[in-house]
A protein has these predicted regions:
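Extended alpha-helical coiled-coil "stalk/arm" regions
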Residues: 156-162
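Alpha-helical recognition segments enriched in aromatics with Gly/Pro capping
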Residues: 1-143, 149-156
Length: 197
């Protein structure tokens, strides 16, 4: 109804009397979804900024349309230097949803598990991959941390790998955590102490 072609996206939508709206040369209305974000990002971040992100479901059409209109409006080739799209967190393999009632907040998780356990659980999956949030995951991470703390020593500390390269590799936190697992396996087998002798 507001588009010339089905593939067009709406820049301005007419508003009904009870809906939010403003006077414009095109009649009373409001910005389309993509335009709202373009205007807010330009107002608060400028015409070009470093990082933009959101869920994987926003890549198309939302972010592509936001790029198209922002770049056209500002006569630029780029809106943001980096685009970061996160995977979804499910709960027991089901999409978290208020309507289903299966949302768990960080605060709720932190009431049951330490902040370190919650952080390790979140970092166990790369940010753009899905993560199934459940008690098994948190219990597993709690056991991992307990084991690491039990085995920790000055010898282990001197062998802890630098995480910088893995973080530069698209925030590859699972790769770094796997290196920590390998380190503590060596510690458990006595390989680290043998190196020091």
């Amino acid at each position: 109804r507001f588009k010339k072609d089905p593939l067009d996206f709406v820049l301005w939508k007419p508003s009904l009397d009870k809906e939010p709206g403003w006077k414009s040369p095109w009649g009373r209305g409001r910005p389309g979804w993509h335009l709202e974000c373009s205007v807010m990002s330009e107002k608060y971040l400028g015409k070009h900024f470093d990082i933009h992100g959101g869920g994987l479901d926003l890549i198309f059409p939302h972010h592509e349309n936001e790029i198209a209109q922002s770049c056209a409006n500002n006569n630029s080739k780029k809106l943001a230097n980096y685009w970061i799209h996160n995977g979804f967190i499910t709960y027991n393999k089901q999409k978290m949803s208020k309507s289903v009632g299966n949302i768990t907040t960080i605060k709720e998780a932190s009431n049951k598990y330490s902040g370190q356990v919650v952080r390790l659980a979140l970092l166990s999956s790369q940010y753009k991959q899905p993560l199934d949030w459940n008690d098994d995951l948190l219990l597993e991470q709690s056991k991992v941390l307990d084991k690491w703390y039990t085995m920790y020593s000055s010898e282990v500390n001197s062998e802890i790998p630098n995480c910088f390269q893995d973080l530069l590799d698209d925030l590859n936190t699972p790769l770094y955590i796997s290196k920590l697992h390998d380190l503590f396996k060596k510690c458990q087998s006595g390989d680290i102490n043998k190196k020091k002798e």
